[in-house]
């Protein structure tokens, strides 16, 4: 019934009201929609917002995938919560099959060094612990900031150029 800012998939998401962004949840807008289930991102939603959602009596599913396989597991859990188990199983089977094909295609190649452009003001990318590195690794790429101890570091254009990425994402 509602989405977070910049939700663009599926295309119908653009037609739904925005009830959250990087600053947090718009509780007035959310409650007006009377949701049956709220999907939250453990790494992206503020803990106090998640606690408030629960205190309001809403059913909250907290997504916290750590691996690419976790995405399939969580999709099955959400499918069960929404009564769409068969559709969920079909989607996850397809997802896991395609993921395995991609991994096999790139596993023997040397990783391509990439700059993953995450945000512009300030310029941010992904470091060692960012989940996006798992996606990059599965298709034969690696962040030029993989050595950063910060998961989502702020960087300068000069730092990016010094690392000489072969590709900008």
Which residues fall in each region the model found?
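A short, structured surface patch at a secondary-structure boundary
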Residues: 1-33, 37-44, 49, 144
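His/Asp/Glu-enriched short active-site or ligand-binding loop at hydrolase and phosphoryl-transfer sites
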Residues: 4, 129-152
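Short, glycine/charged-enriched secondary-structure capping and boundary segments
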Residues: 15-17, 52-55, 76-77, 129-132
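Short helices/loops that flank or line small-molecule/ion binding pockets
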Residues: 27-34, 56, 155-164
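Extracytoplasmic substrate-binding proteins
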Residues: 37, 47-124, 142-150, 163, ...
